[in-house]
Amino acid sequence: MATWTEFATAAPAMSAAVAARLTAHKHHVLATLRKDGSPRVSGTEVVFTEDGLLRLDSMPNALKAVDLQRDPRFALHANPGHHTMDGGDAKLSGTAVELT
């Protein structure tokens, strides 16, 4: 799986469009896997760090954080904003790495 920086280098136009969707609104929808394997959806904030990472923010003991510590796979759906979907839609999936 590519890092955000690798994605941006390989597909600059697409990564710019996705980044625009993710920075247009503060809150997005994160899907994680519960202990029993069923999906959990949660609101989350997304930040692009200075060193080119896509960071998913969470309180340390939030269920989404616990899910990601156990199974780091996730899907993220950008907030579509206004009902006209100006700017398109963005969905991505990946593997989270805990930052301490």
Predicted regions and their residues:
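Short, structured beta-strand-loop surface elements
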Residues: 4-5, 60-100
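Extreme N-terminal tail/first-helix region
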Residues: 1-27
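Short active-site oxyanion
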Residues: 51-55
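Short, acidic, Ser/Thr-enriched surface-loop or helix-capping motifs
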Residues: 34-36, 49
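A short, well-structured catalytic beta-strand-centered motif of the EAL phosphodiesterase domain
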Residues: 43-48
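A short, Trp-centered hydrophobic/proline-enriched beta-strand micro-motif
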Residues: 22-34, 75-78
